[in-house]
Amino acid sequence: MVDEVEKPASLEESKTNTREVEEGAEEVIESDDTMSSLGNPCKAMKHPLEHSWTFWFDNPSGKSKQAAWGSSIRPIYTFSTVEDFWSVYNNIHHPSKLAVGADFHCFKNKIEPKWEDPVCASGGKWTMSFSRGKSDTCWLYTLLAMIGEQFDCGDEICGAVINVRVRQEKIALWTRNAANETAQVSIGKQWKEFLDYNDSIGFIFHDDAKKLDRAAKNRYSV
């Protein structure tokens, strides 16, 4: 565990020490200089995360009814230190600024945000819902909890996704072994605590979602 990443709320303090904001606006990346600046050597010591993570973006303008699900998802950037996370995060659009239909993912490196990925295939997801434009802080704290290894069953976590829709935004936390009820319930309870989220949340198996689509029912609730 990284000392600087103690809990979601405290990580906000490190934001001021690693901010490199450059304005602009195009899809997710706000600055054309963002990726190039991340490649430059940094004189200050960087603080490694336990895992490397990759941001993925599903561009709504690139989707078509004929295209296979997930065909428009593309990786944006992989980071492995606290400082690189903030450099990326501070230069991308937050959920409230994303176009309707956009899906933005953050998954452990080498795990693709798809049901078909071998690590995700037997998993499932917890989901939280928010009014349109109200998920920015909870999305950030979800990311901080994940990359800071705040979950007791963190090895179960694959990643998280924010879905931006017309009337609402949803954050889902993907896990790898849906049948492990003890681990999934622990993750769901801790996630609610980290975000101070009071509504009930449900866990759906990916297998159920593939077979039943929107008719899939929650297997666990907290």
From Swiss-Prot:
The UniProt regions of compositional bias labelled Acidic residues, in chain numbering, are 23-33
Q: What is its main location?
A: nucleus
User: What are the protein's UniProt keywords?
Assistant: Cytoplasm, Disulfide bond, Initiation factor, Nucleus, Plant defense, Protein biosynthesis, RNA-binding, Translation regulation
The annotated consequence of gene deletion is: Plants lacking both eIF4E and eIFiso4E are semi-dwarf and exhibit an overall reduction in polyribosome loading.
Which intervals of the chain are annotated as region EIF4G-binding? 47-50, 57-93, 141-150
- The entry's mRNA-binding residues are 65-70, 97, 115-116, 165-170, 210-214
Disulfide bridge map = C120-C158
Q: Which GO terms describe its biological process?
A: defense response to virus; regulation of translation; translational initiation
* GO function term, MF aspect, one: RNA binding
Where does this polypeptide localize?
A: Nucleus; Cytoplasm
Its domain of life reads Eukaryota
| Modification after translation, per record | According to the redox status, the Cys-120-Cys-158 disulfide bridge may have a role in regulating protein function by affecting its ability to bind capped mRNA.
Tissue specificity, please?
Expressed ubiquitously in seedlings, roots, leaves, sepals, petals, anthers and dehisced pollen, with highest levels in pollen, maturing anthers and roots. Strongly expressed in susceptible plants but not in resistant ones.
Q: Where is the composition biased (Basic and acidic residues)?
A: 1-22
InterPro entries hit by this protein = TIF_eIF4e-like, TIF_eIF_4E, TIF_eIF_4E_CS
What's its job? Component of the protein complex eIF4F, which is involved in the recognition of the mRNA cap, ATP-dependent unwinding of 5'-terminal secondary structure and recruitment of mRNA to the ribosome. Recognizes and binds the 7-methylguanosine-containing mRNA cap during an early step in the initiation of protein synthesis and facilitates ribosome binding by inducing the unwinding of the mRNAs secondary structures. Key component of recessive resistance to potyviruses.
The record's similarity note reads: Belongs to the eukaryotic initiation factor 4E family.
What is the name attached to this protein's record? Eukaryotic translation initiation factor 4E-1
- Which lineage ranks, top first, belong to the organism behind this chain? Eukaryota, Viridiplantae, Streptophyta, Embryophyta, Tracheophyta
